[in-house]
C-alpha cells in the first residue's frame, strides 16, 4: 500500500471484512475498496468474525484500535508505561463510545521480570508475550520452565 494511504486502506479492509463475516449479503463503497452485493461463505466460527488485532502505540493507532480492533498489541519498548498507555486507549474508546473492556491487550516483548509484570497486571494488561531466543529446543524449553517457575507462580 502507498505510504500515505495505507491506514485508510487498513480501515476500509477491516470494515469490509467485518461486513462480509457478519452479513449474508454485503456491499461496500469506500475510497479505496468498492464492491457490490458480495457473499462470503462459510462464515467464521466466531459470530463477529476472527479477532482483529492491531499493534502500535501512536494516537492514530489507538484511535483505529478504539474504532475497529478487538485487541491491541503494544510493544514493551523503553519508556512503555502500561498504566499511561491504557489510559490513552481509554480516552480514544470514550471518544467513540466504546467500552475499553471489549479490547484485549497483549504486550509484545514484555520484560521477563516479575516486578515489571506485576505492574502490567495491576494496570489491567490481559496478557504478555515474553521474549524467547531462536535456540535449540532444549534451551527454549529450559527458558519456558524458568518463566513458569519464576514468573507465573509469582503472578497467580
Language-model segment annotations:
Residues 1-156:
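Active-site-adjacent structural elements that line small-molecule/cofactor binding pockets in enzymes
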Amino acid at each position: 500500500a502507498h505510504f500515505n494511504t495505507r491506514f485508510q486502506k487498513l480501515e476500509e479492509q477491516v470494515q469490509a471484512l467485518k461486513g462480509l463475516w457478519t452479513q449474508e449479503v454485503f456491499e461496500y463503497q469506500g475510497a479505496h475498496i468498492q464492491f457490490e452485493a458480495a457473499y462470503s461463505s462459510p462464515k467464521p466460527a466466531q459470530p463477529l468474525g476472527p479477532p482483529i488485532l492491531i499493534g502500535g502505540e501512536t494516537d492514530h493507532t489507538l484511535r483505529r484500535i478504539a474504532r475497529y480492533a478487538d485487541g491491541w498489541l503494544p510493544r514493551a519498548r523503553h519508556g512503555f508505561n502500561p498504566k499511561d498507555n491504557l489510559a490513552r486507549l481509554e480516552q480514544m474508546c470514550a471518544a467513540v463510545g466504546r467500552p475499553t473492556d471489549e479490547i484485549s491487550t497483549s504486550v509484545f516483548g514484555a520484560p521477563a521480570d516479575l516486578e515489571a509484570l506485576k505492574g502490567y497486571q495491576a494496570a489491567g494488561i490481559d496478557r504478555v508475550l515474553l521474549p524467547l531466543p531462536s535456540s535449540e529446543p532444549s534451551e527454549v524449553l529450559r527458558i519456558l520452565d524458568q518463566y513458569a517457575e519464576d514468573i507465573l507462580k509469582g503472578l497467580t
